[in-house]
Amino acid sequence: MNMNQTTSPALSQVETAIRVPAGNFAKYNYYSVFDIVRQTRKQFINANMSWPGSRGGKAWDLAMGQAQYIRCMFRENQLTRRVRGTLQQTLDNGTNLSSSAVGGIQGQAERRPDLATLMVVNDAINQQIPTLLPYHFPHDQVELSLLNTDVSLEDIISESSIDWPWFLSNSLTGDNSNYAMELASRLSPEQQTLPTEPDNSTATDLTSFYQTNLGLKTADYTPFEALNTFARQLAITVPPGGTVDCGYSACQPAV
């Protein structure tokens, strides 16, 4: 045992909770909660039957809780530093708009000529109009939480639910295959209804519709199954990693 090492504060709390003398864990080369959770619960109990006895399971559980809390705090601090650093860099590199815009300032009357006619009522002053319509608050919050992780919602579900056939192989299908594709699209539920609405046209030949609205002369929707083609013709941006085909026939737009 290295006598220069001392028990970590988190492990000291575990010692207090299970009522063992301070420094007991260090005698058995456990200096932090991470030394304990490197072993499975069963391994730890079996390896230390002689001294904590029946309290070994409780000691491992407490150590695991402390370790998880420390990991969460570490990740939160990392993310906070990353976001603050990006914001500070943006502010440092920004221009002084108050001085550079002299002579080109647009007054409020020009920018919002409707303000003079608005009534001071709750709807007028408190109504919030999202910049992205249709807007789905829960989906937007999920996307924001994953913004700095470079991981999609589909990736998270696929790692935790490997029983879904779609995640095992693209050639396999099942009840959840369509749901897996919806997760991969990064579109909110309301946005997903736009390209998947059924065709309500009574015309048998839709060539003129596709040429007028999407700029391609085609009798059916098949050219637009490729997401890049669909996005290019609509002049919209493909999300990062969105290079896969749409994959199902409901992609034809409603008319």
Swiss-Prot record:
The keyword Translocase does not apply. Not known. This protein is involved in the virulence of salmonellas. NCBIfam families: PRK15212.1 (NF011759). The keyword RNA-binding does not apply. Keywords: Plasmid, Virulence. Transmembrane segments: none annotated. The gene is spvA. This is 28.1 kDa virulence protein. Belongs to the SpvA family.
